[in-house]
């Protein structure tokens, strides 16, 4: 099989996910079920994102000053430390941070890691847009509206140091769901309906096209 005809039936973007329904008509395909499984396998194994959070460190200062410049002493705490002045516990903040999705400029593939910082000064609610990224880094946060935590009191300040790595040992698959069904039409014959669900860091249709590169279509 050398040619595939693709129809986009549905393309929806939501807050935390992207959904695509594709109609796929492979030409001269002897086994449609095998072809569908090969696409599913390629999407699960080959579509990876390697920019992930690999370490999170918390530091607190109990200074009563509201002026950030006067805060000099921060003490490290672990994620199981209970802070009354913060609504969420630190372990839940870790979970929220790991929901963040990152994009990296592909032109700069030499940067293997970077550190980003979140300072909780003079605000009550903090989201991904409050994270400070070094100006020298090409890293971008995709879901800037992702909520991280709320402060109940300004008596304490929390500093979060986050390590982001571009490493093959740390990766996740942005494809969340893959389903396919085989259908038959009297006019065009057999075809495959592919249901793709991904996080907001990737377009499902582009992921599908990328997955085809790993298939030997001539032998399918």
Swiss-Prot record:
Its main location: plastid. It is found in: Plastid. The keyword Transcription applies. GO terms for cellular component: DNA-directed RNA polymerase complex; mitochondrion; plastid. It comes from the Eukaryota. It catalyses: RNA(n) + a ribonucleoside 5'-triphosphate = RNA(n+1) + diphosphate. GO terms for molecular function: DNA-directed RNA polymerase activity; protein dimerization activity. Its EC number is 2.7.7.6. The keyword Hydrolase does not apply. SUPFAM superfamilies: Insert subdomain of RNA polymerase alpha subunit, RBP11-like subunits of RNA polymerase. InterPro entries: RBP11-like (IPR036603), RNApol_insert_sf (IPR036643). One of its GO terms (biological process) is DNA-templated transcription. Keywords: DNA-directed RNA polymerase, Nucleotidyltransferase, Plastid, Transcription, Transferase. In plastids the minimal PEP RNA polymerase catalytic core is composed of four subunits: alpha, beta, beta', and beta''. When a (nuclear-encoded) sigma factor is associated with the core the holoenzyme is formed, which can initiate transcription. DNA-dependent RNA polymerase catalyzes the transcription of DNA into RNA using the four ribonucleoside triphosphates as substrates. Belongs to the RNA polymerase alpha chain family. This is DNA-directed RNA polymerase subunit alpha. It comes from Euglena longa (Euglenophycean alga).
């Amino acid at each position: 099989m050398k040619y595939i005809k693709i129809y986009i039936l549905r393309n929806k973007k939501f807050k935390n996910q992207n959904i695509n329904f594709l109609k796929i008509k492979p030409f001269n395909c002897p086994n449609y079920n095998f072809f569908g499984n090969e696409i599913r396998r390629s999407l699960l194994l080959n579509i990876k994102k390697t920019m992930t959070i690999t370490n999170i460190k918390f530091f607190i200062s109990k200074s009563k000053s509201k002026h950030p410049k006067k805060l000099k002493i921060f003490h490290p705490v672990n994620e199981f430390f209970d802070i009354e002045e913060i609504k969420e516990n630190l372990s839940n903040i870790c979970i929220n941070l790991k929901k963040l999705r990152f994009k990296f400029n592909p032109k700069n593939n030499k940067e293997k890691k970077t550190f980003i910082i979140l300072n909780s000064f003079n605000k009550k609610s903090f989201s991904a847009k409050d994270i400070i990224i070094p100006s020298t880094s090409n890293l971008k946060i995709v879901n800037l509206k992702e909520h991280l935590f709320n402060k109940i009191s300004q008596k304490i300040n929390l500093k979060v140091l986050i390590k982001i790595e571009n490493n093959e040992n740390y990766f996740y698959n942005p494809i969340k769901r893959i389903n396919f069904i085989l259908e038959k039409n009297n006019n065009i014959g057999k075809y495959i309906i592919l249901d793709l669900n991904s996080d907001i860091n990737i377009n499902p249709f582009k992921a599908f096209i990328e997955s085809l590169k790993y298939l030997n279509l001539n032998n399918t």
